From Swiss-Prot:
Monomer. Its cofactor is Zn(2+). CDD domains: Anticodon_Ia_Cys (cd07963), CysRS_core (cd00672). HAMAP family: Cys_tRNA_synth. Keywords: Aminoacyl-tRNA synthetase, ATP-binding, Cytoplasm, Ligase, Metal-binding, Nucleotide-binding, Protein biosynthesis, Zinc. One of its GO terms (molecular function) is cysteine-tRNA ligase activity. It catalyses: tRNA(Cys) + L-cysteine + ATP = L-cysteinyl-tRNA(Cys) + AMP + diphosphate. This is Cysteine--tRNA ligase. The gene is cysS. It is found in: Cytoplasm. Coiled coil: none annotated. GO terms for cellular component: cytosol. A motif ('KMSKS' region) lies at residues 266-270.
Length: 464
């Protein structure tokens, strides 16, 4: 019996699909103004895992993940690069797919682009105006009135009063309430606008998802997902306008992934600590990064550092070492007790850390049986590979994986050597504090120095 944590109720609930054995799943996708970063990777690996498991469990899943291909950031970036928007977004979408393919993220059943659904967006906005949930400013902007929805704030568990009192958004002559948000943004630039009853313009961010879910699911959604950074205001606004349009909510479960933490700070472009997936994957095996993403429960923050990537590599190395020199392609009933444990862990809100511990138990069994009973060894190897494959793991040839360069180095070998040389120069100049600071910096990255009579050598600290 599958239980999923529902953000709306803040409880784990038994998952019962709206239609038996069918799951409608929608995830907010990427705004394609730049390359995908580690936060995108974490969220979409998580929902890829969820889709894989639901299908493994016998559900027919319709998975839709949108692409936002028009907004202010896209306009700014395409203008800066002197490219037409369609050309720019097409290239960014292509790069997104490259990154996701490397991580083993399956292509959704549908990947709608916002600009293909402008008519649907206009239709919903028109209805919201008629129902007095939205108003038109004289400049052509259409704005949603949060005061028209008495349940606004329910998803993020915030009252309208507290939101208004805590708002730092200055009241302007456009909005009746500082928290009101744009449904349609007026624009006279031909390339960036569409005709509407209110004049030329383009859609606001929040209305896009409401329109797309209406088209593909008629707002009948079992699971709606995204990163926790989208909970407020994006998902709150999306939920509010969708309910006001339909007169009811047809989203059963809201799911949110935890933030990526870098140096004890959440990842943010404003903080300048964004790590692009493609840069990480230059030095890190993609399966190691995927394992890292799922080594922490999806709802919890995940701490990105070299040490944790090393741990992910070490874990995968153990599993591949167990599979090495086995023939895991013989379907059998050996190890079904482990499969039951696997189901129990996954049915507990997709508890992947518990699943990984089950994989280790099977691997230990394989290692124990090696050189004792090759037939049983292969049977348990099949069970390990079968279960892991269904979450996107252990597809590589064990020998090839074990021979690869293993994990991300935040410092390259050349950079490490340059720091050691800089430290040696400082020591020769008796700049002891500078030399010690370099040593401490390397230690913080689990690099241990050893000073010999004629040189300094280094090694990774594998005990940490």
């Amino acid at each position: 019996m599958l239980k999923i944590f529902n953000t709306l109720t803040s409880t784990k609930e038994i998952f019962t699909p709206i239609k038996k054995n069918r799951v409608n799943l929608y995830v907010c996708g990427v705004t394609v103004y730049d390359f995908c970063h580690i936060g995108h990777g974490r969220t979409f690996v998580v929902f890829d895992m969820i889709v894989r498991y639901l299908r493994f469990s016998g559900f027919q899943v319709k998975y839709v993940r949108n692409i936002t291909d028009i907004d202010d950031k896209i306009i700014s970036k395409s203008t800066k690069e002197k490219k037409k928007i369609n050309t720019f977004t097409a290239s960014m979408i292509k790069e997104m797919h490259k990154d996701f393919d490397l991580l083993g993220i399956s292509v959704p059943d549908e990947e709608p682009r916002v600009t293909d659904y402008i008519d649907n967006i206009i239709r919903i906005i028109t209805t919201l105006i008629k129902k007095k949930h939205a108003y038109i400013h004289k400049n052509g902007d259409v704005i949603f009135s949060i005061d028209s929805d008495p349940n606004y704030g329910t998803l993020s568990r915030q009252s309208l009063t507290s939101l208004e009192s805590g708002s730092r958004i200055p009241l302007n002559n456009m909005k009746k309430n500082p928290l009101d948000f744009i449904l349609w943004k007026s624009s006279n630039k031909e390339e960036y606008s569409w005709d509407s009853p209110w004049g030329k313009g383009r859609p606001g961010w929040h209305i896009e998802c409401s329109a797309i879910t209406n088209v593909f699911f008629n707002n009948s959604i079992d699971i709606h997902g995204g990163g926790s950074d989208l909970l407020f205001p994006h998902h709150e606004n999306e939920r509010s306008q969708s309910i006001c349009f339909n007169n009811k909510s047809m989203i059963n479960f809201w799911m949110h992934t935890g933030m990526v933490i870098l140096n004890n700070k959440k990842m943010s472009k404003s903080l300048g600590n964004v790590y692009f997936l493609r840069n990480i994957l230059k030095d890190c095996d993609a399966e190691v990064l995927r394992y890292f993403f799922l080594s922490t429960h999806y709802r919890h923050p995940i701490y990105y550092c070299e040490k944790n990537l090393d741990q992910a590599y070490t874990s995968l190395k153990y599993l591949y070492t167990a599979l090495y020199d086995t023939n895991p392609f013989f379907n059998n009933e050996e190890g079904l007790n482990f499969e039951l444990e696997f189901y129990n862990a996954m049915n507990d809100d997709f508890n992947t850390p518990a699943v990984f511990s089950i994989f280790f138990k099977i691997a230990r069994k394989i290692n124990f049986l090696k050189n004792k009973d090759i037939l049983k060894t292969n049977k348990f190897a099949f069970r390990l590979k079968y279960l892991a494959n269904n979450l996107g793991f252990l597809f590589q040839d064990p020998k090839e994986f074990l021979q690869k360069k293993t994990t991300l180095n935040l410092l390259t070998l050349k950079e490490i050597q340059l720091l050691i040389e800089k430290r040696n120069i400082a020591r020769q100049s008796k700049l002891w504090q500078e030399a010690d600071n370099i040593r401490k910096k390397l230690m913080s990255l689990d690099i241990i120095l050893e000073d010999l009579p004629d040189k300094t050598i280094w090694r990774k600290n594998k005990k940490s």
